[in-house]
Amino acid sequence: MADSELAIALVGCGGMMGAHVRQGFQPLWEKGFRSFRIVACVDVNEAAAQKLADEIAAWQGTRPTVRGDVAALLAMDSVDAVDIVVPHHEHHTLAIACLEAGKHVLLEKPLAITLRAGRKILEAARRNKVVLSIAENYRRYPDQRAIRWAIRQGRIGQPQRVYWLDVFERRWYWGWRDHVELAGGGWTLDGGVHFADLMRYHVGEITEVTADMATFNPQRWRKVNEHEEPVTATIEDTTHALLRFENGAIGVWVEAITAPAKKIGTRVIYGTEGAIDLEAGLFLRGRDEPVSLKQLRDEFLASLTDDDREHLFPFGLMDGIAQEVHEFVVACQQGNLTVEVDGEEGYRSQAVCMAVYESATLRRPVKVARVMALKVEAYQHPINERWQIR
């Protein structure tokens, strides 16, 4: 391995790590970005680690070493950075072990199973002066960059209202994600941390949440088509939340994952002069046809300098995972601890989600700042106790 290459270990070789490899590391490598080398694959499931190592060897030319746990990984001298994709309840223990060993860390969202655990991760990163990047890919896609640009350009006027509704049905069992003590919460956290990040990215900071939650149908099936091997989920399946933004805007956020038959997928930001539908484009008062998302994206890309375009979309890659991986590698090599979605940014987005859970638990409005400061932990307390997060 060349001295200039960043030696990276992959911890957790399941589904989402496959996306990190196939949508991130591999296309960068194939574009000629050879500033890194994957040197280890780590998983308690050795077969998964071996399979991913074989896949990487096919395009990298060298096969990563396979290890069964992080302790064995940290005994290796040749690792500079670690990409961690594991169940939420393991984030803080594995990330902190790597950070304390002086390794840079790219950590899949959410930051941690609770904010108290997340704070411990932040403290370890600061203490050891290493890069901590949260794998938040949604905001990096061209459509989201274009939407933010259009809002900042004043195309919809002053943002005033947000309507974010995801209503659908999932009946199949999703493993650890269906258990609150392992996941920290349901789709309001797992997908919701993406959505909270996008709302903050487009509209601004969220300061207060009023929410309610329910579990209407906890039944899942390992064999969903046959209705065989039932499992009882312990996560919420329905969340309704009212949001108040720092700039005066208000929002409605709905997540429902067991609503039968009729789906609702609405993500719209209204301003004083128009609206942006995150799926359909820009709608303006007095104009019959919307500006399509493709047209908006083309306008945004045309507005960029060559340097800005290369910074946002290195090697012309438009995939958000490729961009976050590239940024992480460059930050580690340059000794620059600044990345777009660092631990603090990840903490802020997760705090919005946790404010929803806390408000629903307490049945009253909750200030996000108090949740961030760990002054409100009624929902999170049993999870902290389960994992002895103090």
PLM features per residue range, with description:
Residues M1-W59:
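N-terminal Rossmann-like dinucleotide-binding module
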Residues A2, A81, P87-R139, G154:
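Beta-strand-loop-alpha-helix segment that lines the small-molecule cofactor/substrate pocket
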Residues M16-M17, Y138-A233, R363:
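Predominantly a Rossmann-like dinucleotide-binding segment in NAD(P)-dependent oxidoreductases
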Residues F36-I38, V79, P159, I206:
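Core-facing hydrophobic residues within beta-strands of well-ordered domains
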